[in-house]
């Protein structure tokens, strides 16, 4: 069983999945069934029943195949999730690289800085809270998702490439632990 973590940055608190209430789980599930949110994440809305969605998420979390968090605002209201997944090398080896994913399911929170703060909290976890800190965190976002790119850049990510697909272009971004540490020392994180 993984350790319970709680990481805060600014107005955002991240809590590991076993800390989510049943109501939080229901909201979480609703985000994955929402067409617009799925589109922004390059996915299709989940068709799983609630019980299976929750089981799959907890199974991955408990197997340490990903680090998953519920995202809460300053009033402790659930508003989304952050994950570090696609761990390399794959556990049980000690991972050094992960991919970051974020979903803000509450539309009234979009464009208000919560994403940037959640990403900064996830980077603090990845680079300073894990017993064996990651060396690099990467992500992919759509070229047309300028709001996400701005949030990721504000959290310290840099663009490292573009990936042309048949129907869209992905922006590849990453940050190393060394870059993150330098930002913390300069006081910009």
Regions found by a protein language model. Name each.
Residues 30-34, 43, 59, 154:
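Residues within well-ordered alpha-helical secondary structure of globular protein domains
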Residues 22-30, 50, 54, 58:
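An amphipathic alpha-helix signature
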Residues 26-27, 39, 182:
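Short, solvent-exposed alpha-helical surface patches in well-structured domains
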Residues 50-51, 61-64, 171-173:
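Short, intrinsically disordered/low-complexity patches at protein termini
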Residues 57-70:
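A short helix-loop-beta-strand connector motif used in the catalytic cores of GNAT acetyltransferases and
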Residues 1-22, 33-34, 68, 75-189:
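Acyl-donor (CoA/ACP) binding surface of acyl/acetyltransferases
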Residues 36-56:
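Conserved GNAT-fold acetyl-CoA-binding loop/helix
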